[in-house]
A protein has these predicted regions:
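Active-site-adjacent "gating/activation" loops or surface patches in catalytic cores
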Residues: 171-180, 213-217
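Polysaccharide-binding and catalytic clefts of secreted carbohydrate-active enzymes
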Residues: 1-171, 177, 185-186, 203
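Acidic-and-aromatic substrate-binding clefts and catalytic sites of carbohydrate-active enzymes
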Residues: 154-165, 185-205, 229-232, 236-239
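Active-site clefts of carbohydrate-active enzymes
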Residues: 99-118, 206-243
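Short amphipathic alpha-helical segments and helix-helix/interface helices
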Residues: 135, 168-169, 207-211, 245
Length: 245
């Protein structure tokens, strides 16, 4: 929440500064909201956030969904869990990315899996809420004159909702968001590391439900993040990660 408050303040300051500067503002038609594409940085490689801050935020989310301990206990099939002590599940299936188990545990069902469903939904709700908040700030500060788009909705390649990308309906109904963006699909693009045997050209597919996005009156912005002929490394873009701090 502190990060969200600070980023909101800084975004408002940036938009106000640009809007008040005639030389700058005449070149700006909109804002592309981006925060590591809105999923936790390296969440697949390093796993989810089990910090006290995230545990507390998850507990507050649970209290909205489940008014009483009894409601939570019934949903989770656990007579001992309480709203005051519930935490992020420490045995989240698929928490650490493993390509050999890519299609395992995509769907959850039953009371024993409800705690996982809830955490996945929490992450998606939190991500969508952050984007929605920043979009509102841009629209308010520009009096609805600026276009607002955001990276989001990578359902076709980020299969796990731990990415936070599986709440597109929320943002499709948000009047402050004009569109979404995403890179060309990584799994079938000119021999990427995910699909090294794919032919030159390949499909270059969309990562999201582009037709649904457009039917809801939103823009889809297709990003090409492929290496150009200027590249002098032997590593494809998707293998070139920054070292985590």
């Amino acid at each position: 929440d502190l990060f969200n408050e600070e980023s909101s303040r800084r975004l408002a300051h940036l938009v106000d500064y640009i809007s008040s500067n005639g030389e700058l503002s005449k070149h700006i038609i909109g804002y592309h909201l981006e925060n590591n594409e809105w999923f936790q940085y390296l969440y697949r490689e390093n796993g989810q956030d089990f910090s006290n801050a995230n545990n507390e935020k998850f507990a507050r989310w649970l209290k909205v969904k489940y008014p009483t301990d009894r409601d939570l206990q019934k949903a989770w099939g656990n007579p001992f869990v309480k709203l005051s002590t519930a935490t992020v599940p420490n045995n989240l299936p698929g928490n650490i990315y493993d390509n050999s188990k890519l299609y395992k545990d995509i769907l959850f069902y039953g009371t024993k899996a409800q705690k996982y469903v809830d955490y996945h939904q929490y992450i998606c709700d939190l991500t969508a809420a952050r984007i929605s908040n920043l979009a509102r700030i841009v629209k308010e500060r520009t009096e609805n004159r600026a276009i607002v788009i955001s990276f989001y909705g990578y359902q076709f390649e980020l299969y796990s909702s731990l990415s936070g990308h599986h709440n597109l309906n929320w943002l499709l109904s948000d009047k402050n968001i004009d569109g979404f963006a995403g890179p060309i699909g990584y799994r079938d693009r000119n021999g990427s590391s995910y699909a090294p045997n794919s032919p030159v050209g390949a499909t270059g597919a969309y990562m999201s439900t582009v037709d649904s996005i457009q039917r809801n009156g939103k823009i889809w912005f297709q990003e090409s993040d492929e290496r150009t002929f200027i590249n002098h490394t032997d590593e494809p873009y998707e293998d070139t990660f920054l070292t985590p701090i």
